[in-house]
């Protein structure tokens, strides 16, 4: 599916671990690395497309990740002329327009599987530092990567500032015990008052 301007709608995925590193994948049979990405099918919801690509490219499902952020705007890059192809029957694709998603891996990294389809996109992956991809991706994607990572950096910073949810220790209730103590004190006071009153009355009688 290509829009009127010649751009193919696409989703991009940044997967981070709890250490703040991001998943960096090697394209099949090439010495080229990038984030997982893929086209949006006609009539397909953007988020649905993202989860489909997540499974097809790295073997993860929705339950394996937590969605931290989705970019609000389309980001575009043009393909180099050598990569622009046209067979005459289809609109010419001059580049990609992308919506990006930031995911946190919840499951064990051993569940990452690059061979879920007959034609895998990648044949290797590793964790890299957060800003590493901006310097290493192919030049025509670099501006998009810079904008994406700048946006996602703020999200991860806010995530790191959130306090961990810690269950408050249960406090044993002592009110009942305190009430009993005060009731005993009242009874003792009334008993002492009666004894004093009786002795006082006897004194008057004498």
From Swiss-Prot:
Composition-biased stretches (Basic and acidic residues): 162-191
EC number(s) reported in the record: 3.6.1.-
UniProt keyword Lipid biosynthesis, yes or no: no
Record domain Nudix hydrolase: where: 6-150
HAMAP family, alphabetized: Nudix_RppH (MF_00298)
Span list, region Disordered: 162-206
UniProt motif Nudix box: location: 38-59
GO biological process, one term: mRNA catabolic process
Any single GO CC term annotated in Swiss-Prot or TrEMBL for this entry: cytoplasm
Enzyme class per UniProt: hydrolase
Organism: Actinobacillus pleuropneumoniae serotype 7 (strain AP76)
Name of the protein in question: RNA pyrophosphohydrolase
Gene Ontology MF terms in the entry: mRNA 5'-diphosphatase activity
Cofactor list: a divalent metal cation
